[in-house]
Amino acid sequence: CGTTLEGSKRIPARHHYVGGYCTVCERQDPLRIPCSGDQHCPGHIFSDMPSTDYWSHGAIDYVVAHKLFFGTSATTFEPRTKLSRAMIVKVLYTLEGEPAVTGENPFRDVADNRWYTNAVIWAAENKIVAGIGDGKFDPDGDATREQVATILYEYAAFKGCDMNVYGDLSTFTDMGKVSNFAKEPMTWAVAESLISGV
């Protein structure tokens, strides 16, 4: 979107979207098409809820309807915001009904009385998370794909699921970048269709 000059040089133009369409190049961005606001759409309460044909719309509706996610404010969901390590653990803790925690906080970077404190303690008690080493959990760090796969793998084991399911990572050209700790969880997550390529 912009002006092409001699020699194929390009001056970038500023995209301006109206109803999900760029007024300069007419490119469509489903994330910028507002939700229809139908009362049957749980995410319609968020001003930034993407359109129904956006790939994550149904998943957002599900987590909002089941009170697993509450948005970043009363009116925003921020669908492009990265999931933090604290967030993924909090989701699982909420899914479990937020049981009482009895153990001590094993991580020196998890402060008391934060929105995720009990979730992290619970996850550590049940061997769902083990931290990143040196007594740290890194609650605000981005949850990488292999970390999410590992946390879900340990949660499934905690729930008593059959873990003898193995997928094939050989179809991914970057499989060599998977950390040793995450190889088994990643093959499991692929087999369970929890993770696919990008």
Model-flagged regions — what are they?
Residues 9-10, 21-26, 91, 119, ...:
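Conserved "repeat-terminator" motif of extracellular CCP/Sushi domains
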Residues 9, 177-180, 187:
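Intrinsically disordered, low-complexity segments enriched in glycine/proline and serine/threonine
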